[in-house]
Amino acid sequence: MSNPSNDLTREELAAWLRLEMAPGVGNRTARQLLLAFGLPQNVFDASAHTLEQVVTPRQRSGLQSIPPQLPELLETTWRWLQSAPLRHRVLTLGDPAYPPSLLEMEDPPLLLYVRGPEWAWTQPA
């Protein structure tokens, strides 16, 4: 099921949240994984051997486990998105609307939770 204000499906949102929550995997490592595999779901579909070409065994283990808090966080985030479809949005690193200045950081956040009309956060301050 897709969210009208966001191009993310619920399944895609779950994968992004899971990557963000993976134990031992910070923003820098997550970005390396995204460069290597493309989308978060591809990271989770990768074999242990393939993952260990990019991350440590400890990080691989964290990526292969599903955080117990994920279902609740997914439900809360999805409800938030649905509550104001034209005013709430989750921007991922791969979203064309992700602020370019943040992409220049060494470890930009994987997800940005945006509230308000799009013009308010896309215009320079």
List where the protein language model places each region.
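Short, positively charged patches
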Residues: 1-125
